[in-house]
């Protein structure tokens, strides 16, 4: 070129397979710097962890780390006992729960996950952290977001009535599931409750029915389901505050959605198909078992109670069959005892009692509208005597009573014994007694 300028040709940057170019070298240097900061930071972290004790309140005004160590071994009476760590602050704080001090150190280190999770964590001024009875150690980090924030931390171990109520609910669902699945009251109340709680989920489900298959709108619907569940959880957490500030809107929502849910349930009606009822029964029983297991804080006791409930519910028929088999075996092995015969006095008393009872039943029937009086009168020989009997008179005449006493009473028995002792050779005596017997028989007829 003019002026004698010389141009030097340099090799192309990044021509080799291991070359990164100018931008690549900058990215590598940035990663190396971040890694060095990460290593140096992790090496120099020194935590000042506060030890938490039960029923002891700690007041703090700076971001601190604290740990609770559980040294008590759970007993059988701790099945409904809950350990909670409560963080109550004057302003919003961010609380993070981890397992031990090493996890606390990891929280202090820089990482992409910690950076994004810090934005996703809820910021509350009243936080409850549940600690398992078998958990040896639980640590937490409290981060204040504003200056002049004061907060307190307390650990409590107490009987939780909510766990007991959940256990009773599970017990009721398991043992009364077959009755509840056929109850109209349970059907309408459950339908209204589901409609009130999950109305947004129901709307999304109905909208999904009208969407074409393989449509991108399903991605939005899946996000809508997740967002709806998040809203339901958020509402339940702040239900008391919502009721205090917006009770008019909440009451209007409950009444409107409850009425619409009742209308839908009334339109379709309770379940009538036996298979559908069985499916609902099994669902309620399974839900009851889950409630019973989750409400008991000691796992092996919870499992034992679930097994006992299953055996009690489903083994009543085998136990009844075993009992019947045992009774049959006992009857087969024992000696047969002949029935005791009644004495003459017992036989006479039993006959009188049963006769009196049958006569009273006959009077009641004759006085009832079911008895056809004219047809009955046409079939008897003495209507007046029958009418007197129905009105309460005795059913026998004095002559019939005397004949019965002579025939079946004590005197007739003695007379029959005397007659049997006489010899058959006395023909004249037997002939003289024969007309008397004929006369008595003719009188009875």
UniProtKB/Swiss-Prot annotation:
Membrane topology per record: Multi-pass membrane protein
Gene Ontology terms: cellular component: nuclear envelope; nuclear inner membrane
Region Required for nuclear localization, annotated ranges: 336-445
Pfam families: NEMP
A: region residues: 186-297
Principal location class: nucleus
Annotated transmembrane regions: 161-181, 186-206, 216-236, 245-265, 289-309
Disulfides per UniProt: none
Signal peptide residue numbers: 1-44
GO biological process: erythrocyte enucleation; erythrocyte maturation; nuclear membrane organization
Subcellular locations according to the entry: Nucleus inner membrane; Nucleus envelope
Glycosylation site positions: 125
Subunit details: Homooligomer. Interacts with RAN-GTP. Interacts with EMD.
Notes on the domains: The transmembrane domains are required and sufficient for its oligomerization.
Family indicated by similarity: Belongs to the NEMP family.
Protein name: Nuclear envelope integral membrane protein 1
């Amino acid at each position: 070129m003019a002026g004698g300028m010389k141009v030097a040709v340099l090799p192309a940057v990044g021509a080799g397979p291991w070359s990164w170019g100018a931008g690549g070298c900058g990215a590598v240097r940035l990663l190396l710097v971040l890694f060095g900061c990460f290593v140096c930071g992790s090496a120099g972290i020194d935590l000042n962890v506060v030890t938490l004790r039960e029923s002891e309140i700690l007041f703090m005004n700076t971001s601190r780390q604290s740990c609770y160590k559980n040294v008590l071994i759970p007993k059988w009476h701790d099945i409904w006992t809950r350990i909670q760590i409560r963080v109550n602050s004057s302003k919003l704080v961010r609380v993070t729960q981890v397992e031990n001090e090493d996890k606390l150190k990891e929280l202090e280190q820089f990482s992409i996950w910690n950076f994004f999770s810090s934005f996703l964590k809820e910021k509350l001024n009243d936080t409850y952290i549940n600690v398992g009875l078998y958990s040896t150690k639980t640590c937490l980090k409290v981060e204040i977001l504003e200056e002049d924030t004061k907060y307190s931390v307390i650990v409590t171990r107490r009987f939780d009535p909510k766990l007991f109520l959940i256990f009773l609910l599970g017990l009721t669902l398991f043992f009364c599931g077959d009755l509840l699945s056929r109850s109209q009251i349970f059907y309408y109340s459950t339908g209204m409750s589901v409609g009130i709680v999950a109305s947004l989920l129901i709307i999304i489900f109905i909208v999904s029915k009208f969407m074409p298959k393989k449509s991108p709108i399903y991605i939005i619907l899946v996000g809508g389901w997740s967002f709806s569940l998040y809203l339901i959880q958020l509402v339940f957490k702040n239900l008391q505050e919502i009721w205090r500030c917006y009770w008019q809107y909440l009451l209007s929502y409950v009444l409107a959605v409850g009425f619409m849910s009742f209308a839908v349930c009334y339109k379709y009606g309770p379940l009538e198909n036996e298979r559908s009822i069985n499916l609902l029964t099994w669902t309620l029983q399974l839900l009851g078992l889950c409630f019973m297991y989750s409400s008991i804080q000691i796992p092996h006791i919870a499992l034992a109670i679930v097994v006992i409930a299953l055996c009690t519910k489903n083994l009543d028929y085998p136990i009844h069959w075993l009992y019947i088999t045992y009774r049959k075996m006992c009857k087969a092995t024992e000696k047969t005892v002949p029935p005791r015969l009644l004495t003459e006095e017992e036989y006479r008393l039993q006959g009188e009692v049963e006769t009196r009872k049958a006569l009273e039943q006959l009077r009641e029937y004759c006085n009832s509208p079911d008895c056809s009086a004219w047809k009955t009168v046409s079939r008897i020989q003495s209507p007046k005597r029958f009418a007197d009997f129905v009105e309460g008179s005795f059913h026998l005449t004095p002559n019939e009573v005397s004949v019965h006493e002579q025939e079946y009473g004590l005197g007739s028995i003695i007379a029959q014994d005397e007659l049997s002792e006489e010899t058959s050779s006395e023909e004249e005596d037997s002939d003289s007694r024969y007309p008397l017997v004929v006369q008595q028989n003719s009188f009875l007829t």
